[in-house]
């Protein structure tokens, strides 16, 4: 059961993840965790763990304290760096989010986990052994502690040489502000 974000970096866990050198988005996620807001979430999630699980992670957290200070991170930066170190040292590198999704939706993928773009589940073709219902999004479960994903802001621009700027603005509004446009 993954009810805390530290479970994903626990002993023997090898989450499926698109290798950090495949696309910058994976690195951005890890960098983002060092922001005070997310580092505090990691600390709070750590504090919610049972004592035996805390004891497993504590040496890595302690090891990262001087590194966090050297990098000028906030008071909880050592929790972020520890989580990142454990994640990078344990994930099962994949080439893309598509194969990760295809693995996790099979009924044989019990006790596997991964971090991937959520919209990959939209393209799953349901069958006897394949279903999005085989996946539980940890962050959506009652009682989950810690980080649970992230999203990027959409930046859609209209250039100053656009022949139809109001049409472009209307299209952007449709894509970002309506259910039909967003799901397209």
Language-model segment annotations:
Residues 12, 183-184:
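C-terminal structured domain segments
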Residues 2, 35-44, 162-168:
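Short helix-loop capping/hinge motifs at secondary-structure junctions, enriched
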Residues 99, 110-112, 128-183:
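Extracytoplasmic/periplasmic substrate-recognition and gating elements
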